[in-house]
């Protein structure tokens, strides 16, 4: 019995060229009706963070709707060594600016010292949803940042 083998050739598939997508300026720039207000809130929070950028505290980002203030001093927290510790962040989200205040995450009693109006904005362990360009709220955030910085300084994290 004779077997016939036929060579099967594959057609050449054209190579795909990568198409670069334009990166949006802000994560939700075209999805939120209140976006112009959110940009103002973001810029105000960023201004509150600037005085604390000194020594090992470095500001990262500031564009694209994200800014982070991080202490680059190696620390030990709850028995774990960390190369850095995050302090405060602001991120433009859909419908609000996330004000991430990490001192409250590691020191729950700090929440009792913060103003009740600011605490109403707390929606997670350390994330405050800031939706209004409210001067009173900015004063409360400024006080919170100072308290948090003093706490970090007390612990030797700055």
Task: Please give the residue ranges for each predicted region.
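Charge-dense, helix-prone N-terminal extensions
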Residues: 2-158
